[in-house]
Amino acid sequence: MRNHREEIELALAGGAPEIIPLTFYDGLFPPGFDPKPLQEKGMALCCRRGVFNRHTPNVKTTQVNEPGGGLRTIYETPVGTVESLSKKAALAYAPIEHPIKSRDDYRVVKYIVQDMRYEPVYNFYLGEIEKVGMAGKVICGTVYEPLMDIQVTWIGQEQFCYELADNEDAVLELHEAITENHKLLYDVVANSPADYVLYGGNVVPEMLGPDRVRDFIAPCWNAFGERLHEKGKKIGCHLDANNHTILDTVRDSLLDFVEAFTPPPDCTVSVAQARAAWPAKRLWINFPSSAHLEPEEDIRQATLEIVRQAGDRKGFLMGVTEDIPAQHIERSISVIIETLRECPR
């Protein structure tokens, strides 16, 4: 039986396992789906787990279930109250309303983020490593970078674009507060048993602008990266969008690996282009989601082309980081596994 954990760790260290690892987020399996047959064929698990719990000791947080599956979250602070509303979706809750709805809400959210504390749960993480065993790799999931946190958690993507134009000073003041708070998180993660750490992601350069990625996102990668490198740990980012305008920013950053990178036809940068642009980075791709829906021979050819573009395969891994329609999972993953087995190093 293959030791998937060792194979993944070898690839993340820059080596080339005999067979390119294929991982699947363990949280993406639909209800009732049994992954064991695919694991027996050669699929590994990628298990993102935390090494801390977050809490805000001076903020009263109340959640109220609303008709129609809505979940309202109310944050009460000494400087005011904000609310958000989300609704149950396929695998999580989708945001309907975000906490920041007016300029006055910024000071409330600033209080919340400054009050955030991070409680280590190292024994939980060690237990997850033991539980997964050699079936895959447990990596440390953390939080969004400050600017992405503002966009995704506190404002919402569309309104965020307006806020950058109308209230940029308030956005940047909140960014500074979150950045300062994250230094507490850096220490908790750096002192944890995790060896590979994911920080941030879902960056859409067309929305943020490549200059903001360079000026606000990358410095946070680097600050966290410096702290992790002091402890011999590696940092990666979930960069699953169109990366063609930030190739140089990623190259010049302290990121050790890029995770969830998605090649064409879904996104704009090919595996070959990424390997050429980031020779010092490990590349852990997301197999293009649209390709899972294609006929089996097309899936096979797509796999072969990705392997060809990966070159010497050192520091290269495949993964599934997006949900696949349940009826296509076993068929598509089986083809990819079989194809990877046919083209060993």
Feature locations, PLM:
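A contiguous, low-structure linker/loop signature
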Residues: 63-115, 135
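Short active-site-adjacent helix-start/loop capping segments
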Residues: 30-33, 80-84, 150
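Short, surface-exposed amphipathic charged segments that create phosphate/polyanion-binding patches used
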Residues: 36-40, 62-64, 156, 298-303
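Segments that shape or occlude catalytic/ligand-binding pockets
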Residues: 20, 27-63
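Surface-exposed flexible segments
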Residues: 35-43, 83-94, 331-332
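Active-site loop segments of alpha/beta catalytic cores
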Residues: 1-29, 111-345
